[in-house]
Each structure stands twice: as structure tokens, then as C-alpha cells.
Design a protein with these regions (language model features):
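FAD-site-proximal beta/loop scaffold in flavoenzymes
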Residues: 32-108
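Short beta-strand segments that buttress and anchor functional surface loops
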Residues: 21-24, 163-164
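A conserved short coil-to-beta-strand element within the FAD-binding core of flavoproteins
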Residues: 5-18
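N-terminal periplasmic "start-of-domain" segments of outer-membrane beta-barrel proteins
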Residues: 114-124
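Glycine-centered tight beta-turn/hairpin loop motif at sheet-sheet or coil-to-beta transitions
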Residues: 26-30
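Internal hydrophobic alpha-helix adjacent to the cofactor/substrate pocket in enzyme cavities
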Residues: 82, 93-116, 144-149, 205-208
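Conserved beta-strand segments of alpha/beta enzyme cores
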Residues: 2, 59, 148-151
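Flexible, glycine-rich terminal cap/loop adjacent to redox cofactors
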Residues: 107-108, 124-135, 140-241
Length: 241
């Protein structure tokens, strides 16, 4: 399988039993590709028209999303917005978290703003995909800008006892961390990846180090052992060589 990213599709020509896609690569090269199936994703937009935003002086961006601050309040005092109406990840759990921040604010509390760079993402395909925090490329860029080093470890499910039992050994976990510092990102492809991300999300948000994670016991046989083994390997003492 080949995945092409950061390309710009210029045209799609229907040839009956196949289609021709003309696209431009990031380096400017124009390419023609024959394909059997074309799936087009147009993204999402908010339904913010005709709900009284302009009449109440509420600011929106060029795409129609409502502008809010860290407490989810708009530019108009007393009016808040959360979920798919604001320019944040369009995920149900993110909208829920935003509502919690808003409610705590209304109750007079001082909740921490959501760090959108670390929210958990899940893709319910097969095998499942999940991730939170930085990608490897983003971490490398961050390290270069801040004079830091990063370490990356990919641990497969192929030797995991639970994965073998359920017959789902394809996939891996990838941990990205600052050298001698906190975990920066967790990426999982494999069985129950969306369920396994919870531990990674906590570790990334609590800025746990790989040394912290490596000392924790993961029950056997479970898929979560792969997370622990990846952390142990990052300390320089890999279990499987």
C-alpha cells in the first residue's frame, strides 16, 4: 500500500470502470494516477447561520466557527460556545470536555484550559488507530527549535501474549519522548488501539517520563504490556533485544 500525503488533486476523470486522478506533489511534480475507486471527503463546517450570532455581536472566523477564549466564552460576556461550533477538534469527547470547562467557569471555579495539542484521537477501522500528543516529525521540529533531543521506540504486538490469543498480532505502539524527559506522543495501530490510548493520554498529559512508565506493572496477558515494554526499551534495557 502506498499513501500519498500533502498532494493537491487538480482533476478526476471518470472512465467508467476506473478513474484518472491528476495531482500535484509537494515538490510541484504533476502526476497522473489510475484508480478503481474514488472517495471524496469534504470535511466539516459549523451550522452557524441564522442562529442569532451576528445580531448579538458574536465574532466568528472566516469558516463560520465561533471564536472563544480558554473558558469557552465568546467575545460577548455571558455567551459561551462548545463542541462543533468552535474551531477545535470535532470530537465528541472534546466537546464534552469543553462543556465541563464552561460549566466550572459558570460555577465560579477556575478550570484549566484544554490543551488541544494532546487530545486523544481514535479511528475505528481495522486495525484500529489512535494517537495523542506530538507526531515524530513534530517532535523533531520541536527538538530542533528548543535544543533538545528526542527518542522514539516502536514495539510490535507480534510477541504479545494477549494479541496471540485473540489472533490480532498486526500493529505496533510508538512512543516519542524527550531524551531524559517527558513522553511527548503515543501512536497505536492494532487491536483495541482506541481503548489502549487512555494510558498514553494520561502519561503525555501528566508529563510522565519513560522511566516512570517503565517501573509500572502491566497485567499479563494484556495488550497493554506492549506499552510497558516499549517504555522499558526506551530506557536502554529492552526485554526482547
Amino acid at each position: 500500500m502506498e499513501v500519498l500525503t500533502s498532494v493537491s488533486v487538480e482533476s478526476i476523470t471518470n472512465k467508467g470502470d476506473y478513474a484518472i486522478i491528476d495531482y500535484v506533489a509537494p515538490d510541484g511534480t504533476k502526476t497522473e494516477l489510475d484508480v478503481n475507486v474514488v472517495i471524496i471527503s469534504v470535511g466539516r463546517r459549523p451550522r452557524s447561520e441564522n442562529i442569532g450570532l451576528a445580531e448579538n455581536g458574536i465574532e466568528i472566523d472566516e469558516r463560520g466557527f465561533v471564536k472563544v477564549n480558554g473558558n469557552m466564552q465568546t467575545n460577548v460576556e455571558g455567551i459561551y460556545a462548545v463542541g462543533d461550533l468552535v474551531p477545535t477538534p470535532a470530537l465528541a469527547h472534546v466537546g464534552f470536555a469543553e462543556a465541563m470547562v464552561m460549566i466550572k467557569t459558570l460555577l465560579g471555579e477556575n478550570p484549566a484550559s484544554i490543551d488541544y495539542t494532546k487530545v486523544p484521537w481514535g479511528i475505528y477501522c481495522h486495525p484500529e488507530v489512535s494517537f495523542c500528543g506530538m507526531t515524530e516529525d513534530a517532535a523533531k521540529e520541536w527538538a530542533a527549535q528548543n535544543g533538545k533531543e528526542i527518542v522514539v521506540k516502536k514495539e510490535g504486538f507480534i510477541g504479545d501474549g494477549r494479541a496471540i490469543i485473540i489472533g490480532e498480532t498486526d500493529g505496533f505502539m510508538k512512543l516519542i519522548a524527550e531524551k531524559d524527559g517527558p513522553l511527548l506522543g503515543v501512536h497505536i495501530v492494532g487491536p483495541w488501539a482506541t481503548e489502549l490510548l487512555g494510558e498514553g493520554y494520561l502519561a503525555v498529559n501528566w508529563e510522565a517520563t519513560v522511566e516512570d512508565i517503565a517501573t509500572l506493572i502491566h497485567p499479563h496477558p494484556t495488550l497493554s504490556e506492549v506499552f510497558g515494554e516499549a517504555a522499558i526499551a526506551m530506557t536502554g534495557r529492552p526485554i526482547h533485544g
